[in-house]
Amino acid sequence: AGIHLEPLGIFSNKHQSLDELPDGGTIGIISDTSNQARALELLATQGLVEIPEGDGDVNINTVTKLKNFTFTEVDGPQLVRSLDDYDYAVINGNFAQEGGKSISSDALVVESPVDNPAVNVLVWKNGSAKAETIAKLEQLLHSDEVKQYIEQTWPDGSVIPAF
């Protein structure tokens, strides 16, 4: 089971909802491969793109846009600084926080931790001599105390429990 997630959010300094995407608008999107696929999955949940079926790469060149807009690929940490250049931008919560944005109050949409392959997990090799200790650590990481710690340390939602 997951431990925590730094969720993606869809942000805008120009619009109050995704329904306001203008014809020919722009969406800033993370340029790195794994986070771009996550960003596109989030946009798909909002009816802006359709993800191709199968196990192929998911990127801005493989999705079907369901509205008339363009993507601009940007290095993740730069997205929050250049937010005024786009109608919307999909930004990692930790980058948003570093740029003075709160994922819980400023994002129009936030990525869910439920069944999310991007959640942080504890992994170990079967048969490890420390399996008992690691199992105890896993139990502790999924405790109410850890959940409370995450929620209190990142009240803006830039890190959320995934259990």
PLM ranges: what are they?
Residues 23-24, 129-140:
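Short amphipathic alpha-helical coupling segments at ligand-binding clamshell hinges
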Residues 16-17, 33-36, 77-79, 94-98, ...:
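Solvent-exposed loop/turn segments at secondary-structure junctions
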Residues 23-24, 48-73:
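A local structural motif
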Residues 1-4, 72, 88, 92, ...:
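Short beta-strand->loop
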Residues 7-18, 118-133:
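A bilobed periplasmic-binding-protein/Venus flytrap-type ligand-binding module shared by bacterial periplasmic
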Residues 1-49, 147:
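A conserved helix-loop-strand patch within extracytoplasmic ligand-binding domains
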Residues 37-44, 141-161:
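Periplasmic-binding protein-like
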